[in-house]
Amino acid sequence: GGCRDSKPSGNASIRSMSDAVLPSPPITYAPLSYESRLARRALTQIDMVVIHCTELPDMAMAREYGERVLYDSGTGNSGHYYLDRNGSIQQYVALERVAHHVRGHNPHTLGIELVNRGRYPHWLDSRYQQMTEPYPEAQIAALITLLQWLQQQLPSVRRIAGHQALDTTQEAASDDPARKIRRKLDPGPLFPWPRIEAAVSWSHTPR
């Protein structure tokens, strides 16, 4: 289906009663073709935000990967929100749906993906494990705005974590099967955790 601009569905019923209600950031709701096949959940189940980077060159390729069907259920892997380098935000999956973005934690988390090359295209090559692309100021500013709004909308959230802190599995290196490589390193060493920790009241799961 086509993209349309809207606030994420379901937020009206969980608005904070605080006088200082934060406006919704500008979010383009662009649901994945299989969104309706993802499991439903109550918003109160969400207790953690997980920060990822796409490890892909651009938003178009992130969309292509998100649309890939990988499971018998007719669904694939994606985050809920995607932030481009210029700070624009797209929502691929409604918060009431369980996105497949982090092993073992999907039912109770929401995933935020930042467009960043990461180790692309040598994800599991032991010679290319440095993540060298910085996160632009516009992207981080948009992330902080989104996180502060989500903090107001989802009082059940108590924690924030990087993908690499939750998925610590290793795989054989593509260039040398005798070596083991971390599957996930995102968002990586260039992600400004101190700024994020200062912007929200959630506890940060150790890196």
Predicted region positions:
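N-terminal catalytic cores of peptidoglycan-degrading enzymes
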Residues: 3, 10-102
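Basic/polar, cationic surfaces and motifs that engage anionic cell-wall
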Residues: 18-25, 43, 121-207
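Soluble periplasmic/extracytoplasmic beta-strand elements of cell-envelope proteins
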Residues: 50, 111-113, 161
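Short, small-residue-rich loop/turn micro-motifs
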Residues: 55, 114-118, 164
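Short coil-to-beta-strand
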Residues: 104-122
